[in-house]
Every structure is written in structure tokens, then in C-alpha cells.
């Protein structure tokens, strides 16, 4: 177990429903920070991808091995002192707690000292649905529009968690710059 303050790495997790722009923003943010970008979709098993393609929402049983793989990857990077940007839906608090657990010094509820920071890309169902329809027509993703409502139903963003929130209607450049400012301010109060 790491001693307190041995962890020098940081994770900025871009969260939200499918179609919010997590991967686009995450890649841009990773480039701006000169750090690695991880897409949680790359950690999904083939069976999870197949379920989603068929319009079947994942259960917690489906998600747990996926989240644990992500947690393991993040923990290694944090212990190596790396900064990394992660695009991950992170819809429920319990999922975010698993990801926060990648910080060996994290104590449940100590959100401000955790090395994993969450940024929620917020948008209404109509805006996100239009994005998913465009993406589906370009065959760019396995997640169908039919699962969007189930994602909105799962989304939890408790104020006490100190999740940064930003609107998806802003340009990607403005979103990235805003995230950079928010993260800098949170690291240097």
C-alpha cells in the first residue's frame, strides 16, 4: 500500500451518456496536457459490445469486470506518477467509487483530495440523440440510440461529489479550455 502523498499522478475522467463527446473531448484534453488518453470503451469485453449492439443495456454484473480492468490500469498509471485522461460514462456513483479506488490513498467521501477528478459533459436528450443518430449513420460506434434513455435513467451526479459540469452545446475547444481552467483551479486553490 502506498504511503500518503506518494501518488503524484492524476486522472481526469470525462463522463456522461453516450454521444456526449467524451472521446472527442478526452483526446483533445490529453493532447493539451501532453498525456495519455484512455477510452473506457476499449476495455469492454466482446460480449458487452455485442449486447450493446443488440440494444441490450448492460447490467452491473456486466460492468464490474470492465470497471475493475479500468481501475487496475489507472492505479498503475497513478503509482507511476502519470497524468491520464479517461473517457468513461461513469454514470452511477458506485461506478465512480470503483474508479476513485484506483487512488490508493482515496478514502470514500474524500472527493477533493482524490487523484481522480470527474468532469460531466451535460446535454439534454434531444441534443445527444441527434449526435447519436449522426454517429450511427456514419457507423462510428457500437452504442445504439435505443439505449440512450437507459443511460439518462442511470445518470447520477450528486453535488457532494464535486463533479465539474460543462454543457455539450459549447464548442469542443471551449469545453477543453474550460476543463483546463477548472482542473488548474482545483489543483491550486
Swiss-Prot record:
EC number of the protein: 2.7.1.12
Metabolic or biological pathway: Carbohydrate acid metabolism; D-gluconate degradation
InterPro entries reported for this sequence: P-loop_NTPase, Shikimate/glucono_kinase, Therm_gnt_kin
Superkingdom as given in the UniProt entry: Eukaryota
GO molecular function, one term: gluconokinase activity
Catalytic activity: D-gluconate + ATP = 6-phospho-D-gluconate + ADP + H(+)
Single biological process term from Gene Ontology: D-gluconate metabolic process
Binding positions for ATP per the UniProt entry: 16-23
CDD domains in the record: GntK
Pfam families per the UniProt record, alphabetical: SKI
Keywords on record: ATP-binding, Gluconate utilization, Hydrolase, Kinase, Nucleotide-binding, Transferase
Record's keyword annotation contains Aminoacyl-tRNA synthetase: no
Family per similarity comment: Belongs to the gluconokinase GntK/GntV family.
Subunit organization: Monomer.
Function in brief: Phosphorylates gluconate to 6-phosphogluconate.
Official protein name in the record: Gluconokinase
Organism: Arabidopsis thaliana (Mouse-ear cress)
Amino acid at each position: 500500500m502506498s504511503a500518503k502523498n506518494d501518488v503524484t499522478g492524476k486522472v481526469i475522467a470525462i463522463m456522461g451518456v453516450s454521444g456526449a463527446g467524451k472521446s472527442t473531448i478526452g483526446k483533445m484534453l490529453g493532447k493539451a496536457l501532453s498525456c495519455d488518453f484512455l477510452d473506457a470503451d476499449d476495455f469492454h469485453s466482446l460480449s458487452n459490445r455485442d449486447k450493446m449492439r443488440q440494444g441490450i443495456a448492460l447490467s452491473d454484473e456486466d460492468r464490474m469486470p470492465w470497471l475493475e480492468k479500468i481501475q487496475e490500469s489507472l492505479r498503475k498509471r497513478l503509482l507511476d506518477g502519470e497524468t491520464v485522461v479517461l473517457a468513461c460514462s461513469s454514470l452511477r456513483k458506485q461506478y465512480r467509487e470503483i474508479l476513485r479506488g484506483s487512488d490508493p490513498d482515496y478514502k470514500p467521501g474524500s472527493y477533493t483530495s482524490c487523484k481522480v477528478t470527474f468532469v460531466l459533459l451535460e446535454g439534454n436528450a434531444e441534443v445527444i440523440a441527434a449526435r447519436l443518430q449522426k454517429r450511427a449513420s456514419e457507423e462510428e460506434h457500437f452504442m445504439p440510440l435505443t439505449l440512450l434513455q437507459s443511460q439518462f435513467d442511470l445518470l447520477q451526479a450528486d453535488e457532494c461529489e464535486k463533479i465539474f459540469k460543462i454543457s455539450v452545446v459549447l464548442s469542443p475547444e471551449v469545453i477543453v479550455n474550460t476543463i483546463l481552467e477548472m482542473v488548474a483551479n482545483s489543483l491550486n486553490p
